[in-house]
């Protein structure tokens, strides 16, 4: 079992954690001009 040789500082741990981010959803413009999420059906036009 792997055991850390020395303690990881708060700063180093925080720097590593900065890469764990939530990506924002990117809505796309539909044919009728409304924005929707990709790969979702449009409720008004019933298009995918």
Curated annotation (Swiss-Prot):
**Superkingdom as given in the UniProt entry:** Bacteria
Q: Name one GO molecular function term.
A: structural constituent of ribosome
Q: Where is the composition biased (Basic residues)?
A: 1-20
Provide one Gene Ontology biological process annotation.
translation
Name the keywords, alphabetized. Ribonucleoprotein, Ribosomal protein
What InterPro entries does UniProt report for this protein, alphabetically?
Ribosomal_bL32 (IPR002677), Ribosomal_zn-bd (IPR011332)
Region described as Disordered: 1-48
Please give an example of a GO cellular component term from this record.
large ribosomal subunit
Matching Pfam families, A to Z?
Ribosomal_L32p
> What family classification does the UniProt entry report for this protein?
Belongs to the bacterial ribosomal protein bL32 family.
Question: Per its UniProt record, what NCBIfam families does this chain match?
Answer: rpmF_bact
| Name of the molecule in the record | Large ribosomal subunit protein bL32
């Amino acid at each position: 079992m792997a055991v850390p040789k020395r303690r990881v500082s708060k700063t180093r741990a925080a720097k590593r954690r900065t890469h764990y981010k939530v990506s924002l959803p990117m809505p796309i413009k539909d044919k009728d001009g409304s924005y929707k999420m990709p790969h979702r059906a449009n409720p008004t036009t019933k298009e995918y």
